Amino acid sequence: MSTPYLLIDAGNSRVKWALVQADGTQTHSGAFSHGGQLVKGTGDPLQSRHEPDWSALPAPGSAWLSNVAGDAVARRIDAFIDRHWPGLARTTVRSAAQQCGVTNAYTTPSQLGSDRWAGMIGARAAFPGEPLLIATFGTATTLEALTADGVFVGGLIAPGWSLMMRSLGEHTAQLPTLDSTAARGLLDGDNAAGQREPAERGAWFATDTPRSLSSGCALAQIGLIERMWRHLQDEWQVSVRLVVGGGAAGELVQALSVPYTRHDSLVLAGLALIAAQAPVYPSTHTRPV
């Protein structure tokens, strides 16, 4: 068996990771929070109760990272890797003008988030030769339009579902601040008192403020996705596959009225392809991609 790659996708709320063989076979994977859930006395967001135990894993030959969470999280991830595999060669992926069959149409290609770039590479490999609209429901909701021949023509960024709800709570005098945990039950059809809403009112019309917030912010997300999907269908005059993923996808896709495909590991899949196609360098702590 070949030496695996360690792949790390550090988003704004969670870190997802996987060990992957050179042929793309995933042998181990997991996710943990990098903020808010601290072990008492550590003061380190990576020292959470959800920190993975890598002690029994086979040693990887290199690590490949997408990090959109900032320098502090990058340093903590480095320290965490070094606790298990000191000096492991690692590469922080950056967006490029062209890579792994995807062409970046951004005016300044390096401005594109590495997670979005790796996700498009993963999506193109998963659905080759298809025009795609990729929607990721995370802290931010992002959309990427990818042509059948792999050209990323552009995208959109909007506040995510949780961020939208939290912003309304923090910037208004009377609206509550909802988190995604509280809002999930409200989307299931219960009002704030835990009672089922009458079906004749319609699934999305609420009779209390918390559920109005949850449903309204969810439909703002869905309206954006469906409008842009229909726009691409009209503009390209072809069937466009809508690919959805992200931490809030489970709650939001129930409101979609258009066909979609769920894929929650596009970034890790893209990182695996980038790692497999990268030139081989002598072992170093960090190296170019």
Swiss-Prot record:
The keyword Transferase applies. Substrate binds at residues 106, 113-116, 209. The active site is at residue 115. InterPro entries: ATPase_NBD, Type_III_PanK. GO terms for cellular component: cytoplasm. GO terms for biological process: coenzyme A biosynthetic process. Belongs to the type III pantothenate kinase family. This is Type III pantothenate kinase. It comes from Paraburkholderia phymatum (strain DSM 17167 / CIP 108236 / LMG 21445 / STM815) (Burkholderia phymatum). The gene is coaX.
